[in-house]
């Protein structure tokens, strides 16, 4: 195992909450609806993150808790029943309705599990109700997907069929390319979780081999293991290196020789490496500081160091599941500084002291750092962009080279005007 420098830090944090994950989950499952039980702040957050026009009809909404609800002066359960009835009558195409808890609903101890159970009885055969928490009190924003998938695992039927299960939301075109690669190497029974329709949950069992596409699904993985699924240990499919090793790990689990994998992947990998070169010219030798937010930080650091030759100052991550991240840690250079958790003020002090060329951080920190002359990249863009797979490696590198190019152009123009 790589001898990385592991550290833990606690204190004030700066992260989005798990409600943000609704933005990509509702796109993934168009027959589902996500009803947040929360405040007006919750509603503004999701609306802003999704960029949806006010007259559109998105597949998410907020049942707003008013002051009288929070004060216990009204029956929030009755009001929620009314909202759900109105929603189902207006949107009969909904097949699964997620009741999503928030910080306010958790503070007043609103029992959404019981609400979901009663609604399932009332709408039996028409709509399925599932509940999970998107609260940001103890979690970061990508863990909203973990909560949603964990809530679906008990609904997955059992099977003894041998299959590969890709777990974690992927862009549809990325998923299609992965399935084509797996089919070409001889793995033909491949399914995805979450599926493209919420009512088409894959069946699972002792012959299901799980290959994680996202690193932030610890609770979902735990429940899949309890159902008998095997977990394939692999790096995550970011960049040429990560994607190749990811496919090789799946091939090994199905006893397919690695030569077959390289035969299929080699042309893709060669094209991707050539496409990365123009970005590498910009990124090579640049100092990188990753602040914790998405749990993608370790995989991104590995890609940017190994394939783009960036220098890693510090790699922050909100949480570190060593079992899931072991293969990634093995690919990092020795003595890479990894900090689990966050004390945002101390980390910002280290950012300023290290004078990085690029900081990957949350939106709330980006503008203040830019005002200090430090180039930034929003970490939330990594989950809104199709970055997985060999074909996307150059696009992933481009997400990091563009801020540096922009900064060079702005600096040149500023000097020219003086």
Curated annotation (Swiss-Prot):
Its cofactor is [4Fe-4S] cluster. It holds the Pfam family Oxidored_nitro. GO terms for biological process: light-independent chlorophyll biosynthetic process; photosynthesis, dark reaction. Pathway: Porphyrin-containing compound metabolism; chlorophyll biosynthesis (light-independent). [4Fe-4S] cluster binds at residues 17, 42, 103. Its EC number is 1.3.7.7. Binds 1 [4Fe-4S] cluster per heterodimer. The cluster is bound at the heterodimer interface by residues from both subunits. Belongs to the BchN/ChlN family. This is Light-independent protochlorophyllide reductase subunit N. The gene is chlN.
